[in-house]
Amino acid sequence: MHRRSSGSPVEDDAEDSLSSRIPPEPSNGPNVVDTPEKSRSQVARTGTSIDLRRDATGASTPRSRNSSMWRTPPSSSMTSNPPDCKSSSVMMPLASQRLPIEASPDHQRRYRPSRLRSPWPCSILTAFTTLVASIFLFFILRSFALRQTGGDGCGVPVMSPTFIRMVGFDTEHTRFASKYNLYLYREGGVDPYSQENLGLNGVPVLFLPGNAGSYRQVRSLAAEASRHYYDVVRHDEDRLNAGTRSLDFFMIDFNEDMAAFHGQTLLDQAEYVNEAVAYILSLYHDPRRSRRDPELPDPSAVVLVGHSMGGIVARTALTMTNYQANSVNTIVTMSAPHAKPPVSFDSDIVQTYKQINDYWREAYSQTWANDNPLWHVTLISIAGGSRDTVVPSDYASISSLVPETHGFTVFTSTIPDVWIGMDHLSITWCDQFRKAIIKSLFEVVDVRRATQTKPRAERMRIFKKWYLTGMETVAERTLPRKGVSGKKFTLLTNQQFDKSGDHGSLEVLFCSVFPLQNGKPATAFSMNMDFSGGTSGSTRLACKNAAEDGIHLPASTPSSKRPYDRVQPFSYLQYDLEDLAEHQFVAVVDKANSPTKGFVLAEFSDSSDSVIRARLGLGSLLSAGLKVRLPANRPMLTELQIPAVHSSLLDYRLKIIRKNHGQQQELFAPLLRQSVADPHESKFFVNVKNVNVNLHGLAPFMPPPLREQATLGGVSFHLWTDPSCDSTIDISLSVDIAGSLGELVMRYRTVFAAFPLLVVALVMRKQFQVYDETGYFITFAEGLDSALRSSLPMLLLAMSLLASSLATSTKLPPTDDPFHWRTNSTESPIDFTKNDLLLGSQDAFFWFLVPIFGLISVGVCLVINYVALALIFLLTSIYGFLRSKSGYIRRDEKGNLPIFSSASPRRRLVNSAILLALVSTVIPYQFAYMVACIVQLATSVRASWHAKEAKSTTHYNFANFAYSIFLLMLWILPINALVLLVWAHNLVVHWFMPFSSHHNVLSIMPFVLLVEAMTTGTMIPRVTTRFKHVTSMLFFFIAIYSAIYGVSYAYLLHHLTNILAAWLVGIYFSASGFSLSRLWRVLEGDEAVQNPASGSHTKKKP
């Protein structure tokens, strides 16, 4: 006979239609015996299973498994129990004055058969939705795996590393001496050192590894620094006299700590960095450890090089209280997520990021340099590009933090002579890249200054020369810029430009007439040429060498395949005509002694012929594409500007078709440069025909740049072709939809942790609505089907409209804000958090991603549902096997069921108190949450086994309820797992100091109490008053928050679910008549005998 935990269903047409989808099971007999409310309450709390057996008259008679006496339910007319049966005196009534529970037994027969369903079946609608979601997810993952990110052309470095631990940097200098270590790198056979003298004679450089990174990752950079100084620099007297010395590479061993997941760990590392910097500088004051020239000033600053989160640690160090002013003035980071934290699962990491970024923005917003503590600091952020699948390269942008006068972001594919995209690890060892880094550092150091580096403006000029292509508007030039001109001069050759005094083959000079005057020397310019031919004229040409402005381009020949092939690059010059206003002649001097195979192309071109601006929208580009034909009389360089192509979410296909090609031999094959102004990303394609275009432009969730106009230029394509060939060129650009799907993985990977919680919350909301109205707790699959037919589509539609409106509002200028008068005029008008909501997109075009993510989330939820059901089924089978093997169930009594037993209330209270006490002192609350998840899994397994054996409504209700709570907690578990992983790592490295955070007992107490309440097998009471809307509102609020803020502030999802758990605990306590006197009885041990909620079946003693 099926029994309900509380109440009976109410006649409701809507719920009746829901229950009537499944035909009722045939009854085994004509008679159904109903029990009164007290008997049903006892069944709900003790979990006692009832087996129907027929007597001689054919009537159904219940018998408890653990009782030897037959029990017949009293009739409804009975008002009291017999004197020898006092079960009513020891039972706690489910109903309460605050949360009355419906107790009418009417209409039970109509709903009961349809509710005893297996959790495995799902509706056709749910299955179809999951199928479509699986197709979408398959193509997204396939596109991500097959996307075109460029080949791996990195050379393998050669090194002979030696790491010397700084044992003197002990607890006297830092409290982290037992956790972290400081090392010095020495290259074997190159760097002289001994145990007594470390051989420090250069500029100190400190390397900071990233999240779970090793200090040994520095060996490729440090080895190149040692060998370059030994082979090149030390033989150059001019550079030595200019203050260039070797680089002494130090490195910190963070013990592979995970700063990306824990804000306090990030702060601890930054504190240790400042203490290490102070210790490193002190080493140069000790003549026993240093071989520096005593006439040189002692170093007062250290250059920081950080990889991944090491770059964030470097920036954080400058905001700490133990930071020595001006002890750091140069920071170079590689694949560092400056703009946003990689994951937002920890509140500390989100708040720490905000404090760091606010400090840097405020510092650079000061009017006067004396008020800016970072005035002398230069920050260079280098990103690997699309090959980096660990940290989105969009996050490496510092355009929202640092003005162009103090730093910039550049991609490795932009750096001259590198031209390679790199993954998260290869950026630390790639041979071409490490050479560029080290050479740039050697140019910025100056040991004649106490800061060990050149002034900030000079450092920025050097970094731009080494890291930018030279074609950017911010690139440094020897010839001063005069402004934008309508004409330009370009020169391309496959030879190298000679500097003044070099003995090469080609020299380019910009000359002006320089009449000599008496007493005036002719050495003011790099070269003076006399073309008078022996006549009496005194007019000469005074010239400047253009080699410093030379730009390296990848060599593009008919046999070229990749831009990073180890061949001699092309040399290129480009000037606006106004930049040459002071000169009258361009002299190209062929200095070769014998004929050489090569070419030189130079021309003056008009911007109207060389610049094409495509004025079309993204919709037109998506529907029809873009087609451009270049005429045969085109300039050597043609620039195609497409402002509509600015999003990081779309990929494109570019095709270049040459007409009438092959009639004349070309001097070089077409060369294409794809570029974005902010951040500085350039990609080169040699011998170009077909190009897969992907870029890092406007990306989701990125804060706006300090200069809003920086992102308005879109993408530009520079095409170099041989103008001597009489052939037209057709260029076509189309959106690559299949390739664009792969871009969603890196930009929206955390969405798949937030959006599924929206679906789970709406499903559980429907489950509680049906339960409060009918008394039946439907399965998760039924709830999902019901949500798909009602609330879920409406919520996704509302979120889509919200995403479109948010993207539209971000495009309005500050003056269009109707509330702009409320803002203080001294405050920055830029809202750096405006892209934190929902999709984080600044383009209303992508509103359709909301229903796509919702669709995928439904499929993911159903798949995880079946994975969890399979796990519970497996554990249930093992649990049942052990119970039967132990002899608890005999074969002849397999129809009889055991009682859902649990520990006494006193023991459960003590266990919970101990766990909470540990949370407040030693362990983080994330550990207690994991314990709660395990306990809830065990409860779900036991409930599933009892439901399968009992086949009663009460047991099915509780099994479905326990499973849904477990599924909800399972989706919250990843948010807590990362901090738990950091804590476990600290234990492994024998760091037992408790976290200074994550010990808030209130953050876990509701979960612990809810899980403990469910271990008794007690079904949560129904709420039939208006308080039932509170449950619905809490679930709905969790769903909305998951969609709007779930990506940027995922850690709050735990706290919102914690509030929900507190409400459910409140329902339990309200129905059980919780009071302080009862709590006292539990502590004294009396409740263990009287409270049936503990799971024990109490018998009356004779």
Curated annotation (Swiss-Prot):
What are the alphabetically sorted keywords of the record?
A: Endoplasmic reticulum, Glycoprotein, Hydrolase, Membrane, Protein transport, Transmembrane, Transmembrane helix, Transport
Query: Which residues are glycosylated according to the annotation?
Result: N66, N824
**How does the record say this protein sits in the membrane?**
Multi-pass membrane protein
- The record's region (Disordered) falls at 1-90
Q: Which InterPro entries match?
A: AB_hydrolase_fold (IPR029058), PGAP1-ab_dom-like (IPR012908), PGAP1/BST1 (IPR039529), PGAP1_TMD (IPR056824)
| Compositionally biased intervals (Polar residues) | 58-70
Disulfide linkages recorded for this protein, renumbered to the chain, are none
Q: Name one GO molecular function term.
A: phosphatidylinositol deacylase activity
The entry's function note states: Involved in inositol deacylation of GPI-anchored proteins which plays important roles in the quality control and ER-associated degradation of GPI-anchored proteins.
In the record, the note on similarity to other proteins reads: Belongs to the GPI inositol-deacylase family.
What is the designated name of this protein?
GPI inositol-deacylase
